[in-house]
A protein has these predicted regions:
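Short, conserved loop/helix-junction motifs that constitute active-site signature segments
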Residues: 118-125
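Glycine-rich phosphate/pyrophosphate-binding loop and the adjoining helix
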Residues: 136-172
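Short, glycine/serine-rich, charged loops/turns that create anion-binding
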Residues: 12-13, 135-137
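A generic local structural motif
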Residues: 64-67, 114-118
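A generic structural motif
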Residues: 84-85, 134-136
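N-terminal beta1-alpha1-beta2 submodule of the flavodoxin-like/Rossmannoid cofactor-binding fold
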Residues: 1-78, 82, 86-105, 161-172
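Short hydrophobic beta-strand segments
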Residues: 6-9, 127-134
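Short, acidic/small-residue loops that bind anionic groups at enzyme active sites
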Residues: 100-115, 154-159
Length: 172
C-alpha cells in the first residue's frame, strides 16, 4: 500500500510538539511534511472571492500561505495543530483553514450524504484532522472538522488534545 502524503501545519509558538510528531511519524515510516507557521506572515481570508472569480486558484494575498497551499495540492491529509480560544481554534489555527478556498470552486454540489459542498478545483479530496492545545470544545471541534472535511470531499480523521498525540499519529 502506498503511503499517503501528510501535511501538518503547526501554529503553536515555537513549533511546540513538532519534534514529537516528527519522531512518531518517522517510526511509522510515513510520508509527511511539518510546517511551523507561528512566524509566517499569513493574512486572514477576507471573503473577496478573487480566488474563485478573478484569479482562479490564486489568493489575492501574496503571503507565506502560498507555501502551505502548494503542499496541500498534493497532500492526502491535512492536520492542523492549534491553540484554542473560547473553546475553538485560535485565530492562527482558523486562519490556515479559512485560506483553503483556492482549492475549491465556487460551484456547489450534493455530497453522497446529501449535503452541500463546494466542487473541488483539482479533483483531489483531502482528509482533515485537528490536534488542539488548551480548553477546546471537543464536540464542537469534531463537528467543525467533519464539515471542513466534507467540503474537501475528504474524511474527518479526528480531533485530539495534544496529550493524545500518539493517538492522533495512529490516525495519520
Amino acid at each position: 500500500m502506498e503511503n499517503r502524503k501528510i501535511l501538518i501545519v503547526n501554529t503553536l509558538d515555537g513549533g511546540q510538539y513538532s519534534a514529537e510528531l516528527e519522531s512518531l511519524l518517522q517510526e511509522k515510516e510515513a510520508e509527511f511534511k511539518i510546517i511551523n507557521s507561528d512566524a509566517m506572515n499569513i493574512s486572514h481570508c477576507v471573503g473577496c472571492n478573487h480566488c474563485w472569480l478573478k484569479t482562479p486558484g490564486v489568493c489575492v494575498f501574496n503571503d507565506d500561505y502560498l507555501l502551505i497551499l502548494k503542499e496541500l495540492v498534493t497532500s492526502d491529509e491535512y492536520w492542523v495543530v492549534s491553540d484554542t480560544s473560547f473553546g475553538f481554534l485560535s485565530s492562527r489555527g482558523k486562519r490556515v483553514f479559512d485560506r483553503l478556498m483556492p482549492l475549491l470552486l465556487m460551484y456547489l454540489e450534493l455530497s453522497e450524504e446529501g449535503l452541500m459542498r463546494h466542487k473541488l478545483r483539482y479533483g483531489r479530496s483531502i482528509d482533515v484532522g485537528i490536534v488542539f492545545k488548551g480548553d477546546g470544545n471537543r464536540e464542537y471541534l469534531q463537528r467543525w472538522c467533519q464539515r471542513t472535511a466534507l467540503n474537501l470531499a475528504g474524511k474527518p480523521l479526528g480531533v485530539f488534545d495534544v496529550n493524545e498525540i500518539k493517538e492522533a499519529v495512529s490516525c495519520m
